[in-house]
Amino acid sequence: MCHQTVGLAARHLEAHGIPTVIMGCAKDIVEHCGVPRFLFSDFPLGNSGGRPFDVESQAQTLALALRVLESAPAARTTLQSPLRWNADGSWKLDYLDLTKLSPERIAERRKEFDEVKTVARAKREAS
């Protein structure tokens, strides 16, 4: 879900007395929304809950988020997760850099994405 949408939903919930904490990867967007509590993970977008298939990192991320929820000293508190996507941060150099992909690879990825959307649409329409 969009970081901005989550941030705005959190502000609405907080205005009605429901405490929230956001787990996110887009620090600039979430902080701009002015959320009360935010656990920032310096991971690629879509991985706010920890590394894929890494239950330990996911559990640690959730534990940190709950800690932020119960102990944030003030509104608009941000805590940065100590977890790293990889040791040297090199993922940032390649993440979404289309200049590093051949036109064939871009077409292949687009085809894969379209196939996933087709499956999702069929499931949505079947329900």
Feature locations, PLM:
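Extended, histidine- and acidic-residue-enriched regions that form the cofactor-binding/catalytic faces
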Residues: R67-S127
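Short, acidic/turn-prone active-site loops that include or flank metal/cofactor-
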Residues: C25-K27, F43-G46
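Short, acidic/small-residue loops that bind anionic groups at enzyme active sites
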Residues: H3-C33
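A short acidic, often aromatic-flanked loop/helix-cap motif at beta-alpha or helix-coil junctions
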Residues: L45-G50, N86
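Short, hinge-like loop/turn segments at secondary-structure boundaries
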Residues: R37-D42
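A charged, well-structured terminal subsegment
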Residues: S48-T77
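Surface-exposed loop/turn and secondary-structure junction residues enriched for glycine/proline
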Residues: H32-C33, S48, P82
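Alpha-helix N-cap/helix-initiation motif
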Residues: C2-H3, D54
